[in-house]
Swiss-Prot record:
It comes from Phocaeicola vulgatus (strain ATCC 8482 / DSM 1447 / JCM 5826 / CCUG 4940 / NBRC 14291 / NCTC 11154). Pfam families: Ribosomal_L22 (PF00237). This protein binds specifically to 23S rRNA; its binding is stimulated by other ribosomal proteins, e.g. L4, L17, and L20. It is important during the early stages of 50S assembly. It makes multiple contacts with different domains of the 23S rRNA in the assembled 50S subunit and ribosome. The globular domain of the protein is located near the polypeptide exit tunnel on the outside of the subunit, while an extended beta-hairpin is found that lines the wall of the exit tunnel in the center of the 70S ribosome. Belongs to the universal ribosomal protein uL22 family. CDD domains: Ribosomal_L22 (cd00336). Keywords: Ribonucleoprotein, Ribosomal protein, RNA-binding, rRNA-binding. Part of the 50S ribosomal subunit. GO terms for cellular component: cytosolic large ribosomal subunit. The keyword Transmembrane helix does not apply. GO terms for biological process: translation. GO terms for molecular function: rRNA binding; structural constituent of ribosome. HAMAP family: Ribosomal_uL22_B (MF_01331_B). The lineage of its organism: Bacteria, Pseudomonadati, Bacteroidota, Bacteroidia, Bacteroidales. This is Large ribosomal subunit protein uL22. SUPFAM superfamilies: Ribosomal protein L22.
Length: 136
C-alpha cells in the first residue's frame, strides 16, 4: 500500500470511530418502497422513530426498526453507557439500490416479460444532539 493511500485509510478509520451507524445490505425490497420508510424517520429522535416504525403498516418498517435498534446499540457500545431518552437522533439515513435479479415471466404468443426483483442497501447514522450542534 502506498504512503498516501495508507494515510487516507488511517484518516478514514479515525473518522469511523466517531460515527455511529448500522448497515443493512441486500434487502429484498425495492429501493423506492424502502425510501418511503426512510423519509418517515429522517431527523427524528430515536424513541419517537421507533414508535413510528412500530405502528407503520409498511413491510419495510420492521427491517428499518431492527436496523435502528442496532445503530443505537452501536452508539452505546462505543460510548460505554446507555442512551438516555431524547439524547439520540437519526442524523442520516439513505437507501441505495442493490443487486437486481432478472427473471422471465411467460407472456402471450411465445414471448417472455422480464421481471426485475430489486434489492437495496440501507445505511443509518445516529448521533447525540450536542455533537450535531457543534458540527453545524
Amino acid at each position: 500500500m502506498g504512503a498516501r493511500k495508507k494515510i487516507s485509510a488511517e484518516k478514514r478509520k479515525e473518522a469511523l470511530k466517531t460515527m455511529y451507524f448500522a448497515k443493512l445490505q441486500n434487502v429484498p425490497t425495492s429501493p423506492r418502497k424502502m425510501r418511503l420508510v426512510a423519509d418517515m424517520i429522517r431527523g427524528m429522535e430515536v424513541n419517537r422513530a421507533l414508535g413510528v416504525l412500530k405502528f407503520s403498516s409498511k413491510e419495510a418498517s420492521a427491517r428499518v426498526e431492527k436496523l435502528l435498534r442496532s445503530a443505537i446499540a452501536n452508539w452505546e457500545q462505543k460510548n460505554e453507557r446507555k442512551a438516555e431518552s431524547g439524547e439520540l437522533f437519526v442524523t442520516k439515513i439513505y437507501v441505495d439500490g442493490g443487486a437486481t435479479l432478472k427473471r422471465m415471466r411467460p407472456a402471450p404468443q411465445g414471448r417472455g416479460y422480464r421481471i426485475r426483483k430489486r434489492s437495496n442497501h440501507v445505511t443509518l447514522f445516529v448521533d447525540s444532539k450536542s455533537t450535531n450542534d457543534n458540527q453545524n
